[in-house]
Structures are given as C-alpha cells and as structure tokens.
Design a protein with these regions (language model features):
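Adenylate-forming
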Residues: 63-65, 76-80, 105-106, 133, ...
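Conserved beta-loop-beta connector loops within the AMP-binding
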Residues: 232-255, 260-263
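Conserved S/T- and glycine-rich ATP-binding loop of Class I adenylate-forming
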Residues: 50, 56-59, 81, 93, ...
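Conserved AMP-binding/adenylation subdomain of ANL enzymes
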Residues: 74-92, 102-142, 157-158
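Short beta-strand->loop structural element characteristic of the AMP-binding/adenylate-forming
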Residues: 1, 65-67, 116-124, 153, ...
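Gly/Ser/Thr-rich phosphate-binding loop
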Residues: 115, 141-145, 155-219
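Conserved pre-ATP/AMP-binding loop-to-beta segment of ANL
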Residues: 10-11, 23-55, 62, 72-77, ...
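Structural core segment of the AMP-binding/adenylate-forming
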Residues: 1-31, 139-140, 147-148
Length: 268
C-alpha cells in the first residue's frame, strides 16, 4: 500500500491455500483469463528502454541496481538460445532457478524463439532426490538447465537415470560454478550419453553468457566450449595483463556488446 505507483496486484492461486477472497486492488488471475474481452494497448518505446533491474551481489558494498535495456536483452538472448543452444519454436525449456537469479531472466528469453518455458516451485531434492530429472522426462523437456552443484549432488548420491525416458532432452546447461570433469563423466554415463552438455558462464552484469556451449565444437570434460558469438572475450590478470597458457584469470569483454547495462537505476 505504501508504493503509490502500484495500481493493481494479480494473485496466482497456489495449491489449496487460496480461498478466493481478495481485498480491494487485488485481482484473481483465473478471473482475468476468463474475461471475454480484455482491453490491450501497445506503445512504442526506444530500443534500450529499461526492461530488467538486477541487483549485484553486494560483495563490494550496497547492492547496485543494474538496469538492462529491452532490445539489448532480446538480441542477446535470442542469439544464445537459437545459435548456441539450438532451441527451436515449440521446444520446451526448463531452467531450475529462483526468480532472484539472473537465470530466471535468461529463461524468459526463450519465449523470443517461440519456445515454451517451464517453472518449478519447490526443492530440487524433494519429495525425491531425482525429482527434476523425472520432471524433464514427464514434460518431455528439450533444454534442461541447472547448477553445477546439483549435478555434483546427483553424482555423490550415485543416482542413475538410464531408465528415464529422456529422448527429447537435447541439451543440459550448467552454471553457477565450474562443472568439473567428473560431473561431465557422470552426466554422459548416468543421465544420457548423447546429450549436449554445455557448461556456461556469464553474470548479472550482462544478464547473459560470456562463454558457453555451441553446436560445432567438441565437448571436453571440465571445459567450456567457447566464447559467445560476437563477443570479444579474453582473460586477464588482476593487474590488467593478458593471461597466457593454462592459468586462472578474470573474464573480460574488450569491445561493446548488446547487453551492456544501460545505467544504474536512479543513479545521479
């Protein structure tokens, strides 16, 4: 009530907890869908009109309100889904994520291809430890995304999914932390031997990927296939020197790219 700009709140009935009674200013989503006529208005906005506000982690102070533009995000996500992940119209995309993680925004981007997106509300290990894989089999998911930690959990639990019907599953994407060699081996041995396993890395700052999978390069256990198309990505030391050889460093984009943040919200 204290946020004056909010005019209405749409309520999505959840389980058996909703009794249908709503206060003024609240509307039942099902009743809205049931209306025969819904007034729609479409307005034109600039290409980089604000679309998302994502918050930095807060490790370097107060979280920053990183603002991303609509057209910018549309181009980047369309590229990543269509050219890197081979998602097609009518495919089914499921990334297990909270709404506060940038992977939720990334998941929404699959709609630009004409794909259907699937949301899962609940624990990834309850009521059974293999519930997400069963969900993929039941819903015939084409692209399944999850954290590297989850794959490591499945490996430690020594679970096997060869009896699950995963013929529709073309791609498994992993992010959040590096996907180690042993996790790659587990996926191909215990989940599906002919799936495209893509370790990806990006971030809130770019609401997309810097490096990720592709359809043309070989998949090597413990490695990421390559750079995101059109991005000039390199690795530098903390002192600004280019890393040579098999050494650790910081991912750097050296030239402009679509999903550069347009501003910090209310930055003066």
């Amino acid at each position: 009530k204290k946020i004056k700009s909010i005019k209405e709140v749409i309520v999505f009935p959840y389980g058996n907890k909703f009794d249908g009674k709503l206060s003024s200013g609240f509307k039942d989503f099902n009743l809205i869908l049931g209306k025969s006529k819904i007034d729609k208005s479409f307005k034109k906005f600039p290409f980089n009109h604000p679309l998302y506000i994502l918050y930095s982690s807060g490790t370097t102070g107060v979280p920053k309100c990183i603002t991303h533009g609509a057209g910018n995000v549309l181009i980047e996500h369309n590229k990543e889904f269509s050219l890197h992940c081979n998602v097609k119209s009518n495919d089914k995309v499921f990334y297990y994520t909270t709404t506060g993680w940038m992977m939720w925004n990334w998941l929404v981007g699959a709609l630009s291809i004409g794909a259907s997106i699937y949301l899962y509300d609940g624990s990834p290990t309850y009521p059974t430890k293999d519930i997400l894989i069963k969900f993929c089999a039941k819903e015939k998911i084409n692209l399944f995304g999850v954290s590297a930690k989850y794959i490591d959990f499945l490996k430690k639990e020594k679970l096997n999914f060869k009896n699950q019907k995963l013929s529709n599953l073309n791609t498994i994407a992993s992010t959040g932390s590096p996907l180690v060699k042993e996790s790659f081996e587990f996926v191909y041995k215990n989940i599906k031997k002919d799936v495209h396993l893509a370790s990806i890395s990006g971030g809130t700052d770019v609401v997309g990927c810097l490096v990720l999978g592709n359809l043309f390069s070989k998949v090597y256990a413990g490695e990421i296939q390559g750079e995101s198309l059109g991005l000039d990505v390199d690795i530098y030391t903390e002192n600004g020197k280019k890393v040579s050889g098999n050494k650790k460093g910081e991912l750097v984009i050296k030239k402009p790219f679509p999903t550069m943040p347009i501003k910090f919200w209310n930055d003066k």
